[in-house]
UniProtKB/Swiss-Prot annotation:
Residues 93-132 form the Agouti domain. Glycans are attached at residue 39. Residues 61-87 are annotated as: Disordered. This is Agouti-signaling protein. Residues 61-79 have a biased composition (Basic and acidic residues).
């Protein structure tokens, strides 16, 4: 009984190690110097070095001003787009996507038709064909 438990514990440890090792990305796997030298396709000197520079107060202020200018220009552009007032629909018709229960008049759009659902409890004007 103790031998089987020891064997199962060893198998469990091996599986845990194998699972953890197989999920490491290729660049995080352990390598020795010989494998780095022999692998000519990956040369660490080919990659450019990364330099980190701290921003001074002046550059921070400039970037803030640029961000504020972008925000204000977006607000101005949105304010310039004024919604056109809709033309009032004539009384004897129903607008698209509005309720059109049977006592109501026909739909205003010639391509739309009145569709009812749920035993004619919810009816609305809908456009069926895009080519119309």
């Amino acid at each position: 009984m103790d031998v089987t438990r020891l064997l199962l514990a060893t198998l469990l440890v091996f599986l845990c190690f194998f699972t953890a090792y197989s999920h490491l990305p290729p660049e995080e796997k352990l390598r020795d110097d010989r494998s780095l030298r022999s692998n000519s396709s990956v040369n660490l000197l080919d990659f450019p070095s990364v330099s980190i520079m701290a921003l001074n107060k002046n550059s921070k202020e400039i970037s803030r001003k640029e961000a504020e200018k972008k925000r204000s220009s977006k607000k101005e552009a949105s304010m310039k787009k004024v919604a056109r007032p809709r033309t009032p629909l004539s009384a004897p018709c129903v607008a698209t996507r509005d309720s059109c229960k049977p006592p109501a008049p026909a739909c205003c759009d010639p391509c739309a038709s009145c569709q009812c659902r749920f035993f004619r409890s919810a009816c609305s004007c809908r456009v069926l064909s895009l080519n119309c």
